[in-house]
Amino acid sequence: MAVKIRLTRMGSKKKPFYRINVADSRAPRDGRFIETVGTYNPLVAENQVTLKEDRVLDWLGKGAQPSDTVRSLLSKAGVMAKFHDQKFSK
């Protein structure tokens, strides 16, 4: 089963709000998911992102592939650097 970390759209029309979910790559965008690991609100001036860093690092360690947008959000939050350090420090 190929697992992806990607955004799921929530909110109302013209007011998007996203959950960062771990899901099977074959599932629909707003469909079935395995776990919610964070949120992203693009409407706030500083683009508010909340993450469960330990769970994100766990899923990345298990081989989950982040989407391009999620990879960008994780990089800005410093999670990808931590994952890289963990992976190559052994």
Curated annotation (Swiss-Prot):
<dbReference type="GO" id="GO:0003735">
    <property type="term" value="F:structural constituent of ribosome"/>
</dbReference>
<keyword id="KW-0689">Ribosomal protein</keyword>
<comment type="similarity">
    <text>Belongs to the bacterial ribosomal protein bS16 family.</text>
</comment>
<keyword id="KW-0687">Ribonucleoprotein</keyword>
<dbReference type="GO" id="GO:0005737">
    <property type="term" value="C:cytoplasm"/>
</dbReference>
<protein>
    <recommendedName>
        <fullName>Small ribosomal subunit protein bS16</fullName>
    </recommendedName>
</protein>
<dbReference type="Pfam" id="PF00886">
    <property type="entry name" value="Ribosomal_S16"/>
</dbReference>
<dbReference type="InterPro" id="IPR000307">
    <property type="entry name" value="Ribosomal_bS16"/>
</dbReference>
<dbReference type="GO" id="GO:0015935">
    <property type="term" value="C:small ribosomal subunit"/>
</dbReference>
<dbReference type="GO" id="GO:0006412">
    <property type="term" value="P:translation"/>
</dbReference>
<dbReference type="InterPro" id="IPR023803">
    <property type="entry name" value="Ribosomal_bS16_dom_sf"/>
</dbReference>
